[in-house]
Amino acid sequence: SQPKMTENKQRLSFWQIWNMSFGFLGIQFGFALQGGFMSRIFQTLGADKDAIPLLWIAAPLTGLLIQPIVGYLSDRTWHPKFGRRKPFFFFGALLSTVALFFAPYSSALWMAAGALWILDASINISMEPFRALVADKLPDSQRSYGFVVQTLIIGIGTWVASNLPWLMTKIGVPNTAAEGIVPDSVKYAFAIGAFVLFSSILYTILTTDEYPPENVEEFEKEKAKNKGFFSGFVEIIKSISEMPTVMKQLGVVQFFSWFAFFTMWSFATPAITEHIFGATDTTSVEYNNAADSVGSYLGTYGLVSMFYALILAFVASKIKINRKF
């Protein structure tokens, strides 16, 4: 079972909630640059468009494995100085920053695919504890508000990061390069993203405290009892089997939603650059300007998603929803 944390939680101010959620800005910078421009990097390195989904496959497989493991481990972590979730924030941010910075410098497809794999794994290490932090820190009456603040930060991060290559081009950074070389506009965008990712997560680490377990001695006993790989594996399987019905229903919805997400992220750049802009030469001005535009379109999608999420959160808080199926 999951060790209990302190239940007497104080109501937090807007800025306290903002501080604890601010790291999501960097996480979303990483996800937006990954989702909007990794296919562009793959194509620049010579990938055929039909092979792009295979190059992407590491990302969802990594998330499938990393998320339950990180969730299990972070639930059973406590250090008087470093807290419960913050060690995962830090190490995930460190690895993500390195992978994000070096991804556009890949000289071969296997290097770019490896960078994507490391980037996705590292972002998941930071992201999952961030979601759990809302439940850790906020009383029940403020949890919805906490997720709304996270949604706001996610939308801002998606829009800004997705427009970075376009902005770099506008201020004069070269947007084309020789065959097999990623343009400087993309390299600069990923470097800025790496800086924002690490600094925003570090800001949350430095400005946010965590509640200790209700009973530290009991917490340590529980952790010792479930020590080891096999115990952890059994606990994860047990948690999945005992998942509430509503979560299982949500899982089905998410399962089908990700068909669309994965198709969009992997194929948006090759499809739009070729069929809308008529550009297939990755060294041409036309292709790279079109690829910048694809990123901007995905940024707009993120911004619109944010507004709809805020509207739905408001509606859900005002209207009693019948959840019978």
Give the ranges of each region predicted by the language model.
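Helix-loop boundary and gating motifs at the non-cytosolic
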Residues: 6-62, 248-253, 257-282
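Helix-to-loop junctions at the C-terminal end of transmembrane segments
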Residues: 65-82, 307-321
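MFS transmembrane alpha-helix packing/gate-lining sites
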Residues: 62-66, 153, 157, 300-308
